[in-house]
Swiss-Prot record:
The keyword ATP-binding applies. SUPFAM superfamilies: C-terminal domain of ProRS, Class II aaRS ABD-related, Class II aaRS and biotin synthetases. GO terms for cellular component: aminoacyl-tRNA synthetase multienzyme complex; cytoplasm. The keyword Phosphoprotein does not apply. It holds the Pfam family tRNA-synt_2b. GO terms for molecular function: ATP binding; catalytic activity, acting on a protein; proline-tRNA ligase activity; transferase activity. This is Proline--tRNA ligase. Catalyzes the attachment of proline to tRNA(Pro) in a two-step reaction: proline is first activated by ATP to form Pro-AMP and then transferred to the acceptor end of tRNA(Pro). Consists of three domains: the N-terminal catalytic domain, the anticodon-binding domain and the C-terminal extension. PROSITE patterns: AA_TRNA_LIGASE_II. It is found in: Cytoplasm. It comes from Clostridium botulinum (strain ATCC 19397 / Type A).
Length: 478
């Protein structure tokens, strides 16, 4: 049992050092490993399996909405990147450049894509002539590169995986509606699959995507009270269409520019799962996103009939859930600690006495509750238990978020709250960027979003005291 204890002792308590706790879980749960390239990571099977399940959900939804997957080049010529001024200025500090092919210097530098708007625009300009060609609903799954100064696995890496959607539409109304439709899908992904509550809203002009008219966001709150942007959807207006001369003949035969949307979620969602649900024993995976939803642990497996029954149970459960049987010769206690660390939502124990009674023991990862169930109805009981676990994890995360959401009506309250009670701060704002800049300068907090569900917590701006225009969620963020 000393080994079992050591297994968990290797995790730094989150209250002692949250950043180290996070890193310990990434490594101990075998989600990712560091590579020899600064800021790049090796996503291991446990981590990639989570991403695959995110992919399945998002890809299925996008295809239901009529999107098609494509693949764009990884390189962008410098002249192409320069076409949209605000866009290139927003990404210039993070761009990685290719200057040589073999020993030969290239005639023009190639950017390793930080995002692909320019490539999609170049393509759309070639294939769109008429309103009958619209809308174009494209998506791609790929990796992108942004030369970050400070990196952390999943949360901020030089290279990361994502999906990026790029659509063009006949009208502003259609494009804006589509942008919000995608944001709603991202919200459902977080709540229905990741058991992670989010606040939906619109970014301020200061925080919106480079080159966008409007940026919509879903914001989540981590255990340590920091915010994390979990997904964004942007309405780019006609800015990119005009920059890249994408034109179509409208219903009256006149030339017009299509309205553009772009949106993405990334592997940083895996980091969010860790920081919303994890505890000092390791990872806690929401059942619907977990690569392995249940693990069967035979107890006293050397005794006659135990392994055979465990294998029979696995075969039965594999038809309804993602299940693993651990029939290794490690002690059951070691296995319990290992799978608790790795966040497997449900442990199923079966031993000689259980077989005699035609039962198995279900142990929940989220709260360690044990339930005895009959083997005759174990398929339905396991599925029911996984749904119960998901709902319980979502409610617990909502409770934590709500407990760490505060109201401030002046800067004194704001500063005191951000220093002593980390979390979301709801405060009114006049709409002046100078106030937004001052809040960041003084407190380190940024505007996370202007929530769609507006409320009035004060009549005046938290910073300057002038008449307020919007409620804003503020917070320090990843």
């Amino acid at each position: 049992m000393a080994g079992d204890k050591k297994f968990v002792e290797d995790i730094t308590p989150m209250d002692e050092d949250f950043a180290q706790w996070y890193t310990d879980i990434v490594k101990k749960a075998e989600l990712a490993d560091y590579s020899s390239i600064r800021g790049c990571m090796i996503i291991r099977p446990n981590g990639y399996g989570i991403w695959e399940n995110i992919q399945k959900y998002v890809d299925t939804k996008l295809k239901e909405y009529g999107h098609e997957n494509v693949s764009m080049p990884i390189f962008i010529p410098e002249n192409l990147l320069q076409k949209e001024k605000d866009h290139v200025e927003g990404f210039a500090p993070e761009v990685a450049w290719v200057t040589h092919g073999g020993d030969d210097e290239l005639a023009e530098r190639l950017c390793v894509r930080p995002t692909s708007e320019t490539l999609f625009c170049e393509h759309y300009a070639k294939i769109v002539q008429s309103y009958k060609d619209l809308p174009k609903l494209y998506n791609q799954w790929c990796s992108v590169v942004r030369w970050e100064k400070t990196t952390r696995p999943f949360l901020r890496t030089t290279e990361f995986l994502w999906q990026e959607g790029h659509t063009i539409h006949e009208t502003k109304e259609e494009a804006e509606s589509h942008s919000l439709k995608i944001l709603n899908m991202y919200s459902r992904l977080c709540e229905d699959m990741l058991a992670m509550p989010v606040v939906m809203g619109k970014k301020t002009d200061k925080e919106k995507f480079a080159g966008a008219d409007d940026t919509y966001t879903i914001e989540s709150l981590m255990h340590d009270g920091k915010a994390l942007q979990a997904g964004t959807s942007h309405y780019l207006g006609q800015n990119f269409s005009k920059a890249f001369a994408i034109q179509f003949s409208d219903r009256n035969g006149k030339l017009d520019y299509p309205h553009y949307t772009t949106w993405a979620v990334t592997t940083r969602l895996i980091g969010a799962i860790i920081m919303v649900h994890g505890d000092n024993s390791g990872l806690k995976l929401p059942p619907r996103i977990a690569p392995t939803q249940a693990v069967i642990i035979p107890v006293a497996q050397h005794k006659e009939g135990v392994l055979e029954k465990a294998k029979e149970l696995k075969e039965k459960l594999a038809k309804v859930v993602r299940v693993k049987l651990d029939d290794s010769d490690k002690m059951p206690g070691w296995k319990y600690s290992e799978y608790e660390m790795k966040g497997i939502p449900l442990r199923i124990e079966i031993g000689p006495k259980d077989i005699e009674k035609n039962q198995a023991v279900l142990v929940r990862r989220d709260n360690r509750e044990k339930t005895i169930v009959s083997l005759d109805e174990i398929e339905i009981k396991v599925q029911e238990m996984l749904d119960i676990i998901h709902n319980s994890m979502l409610e617990e995360a909502k409770k934590t978020r709500d407990e760490k959401t505060y109201v401030a009506t002046n800067m004194e309250e704001f500063e005191d709250t951000i220093e002593n009670k980390p979390g979301f701060i709801k405060a009114m704002w006049c709409g002046d960027r100078a106030c937004e800049d001052k809040i960041r300068e003084v407190t380190g907090a940024t505007s996370r979003c202007m929530p769609f569900e507006q409320e009035v917590v004060s009549d005046t701006c938290v910073c300057c005291g002038k008449k307020a225009k919007n409620l804003v969620y503020w917070g320090r963020a990843y």
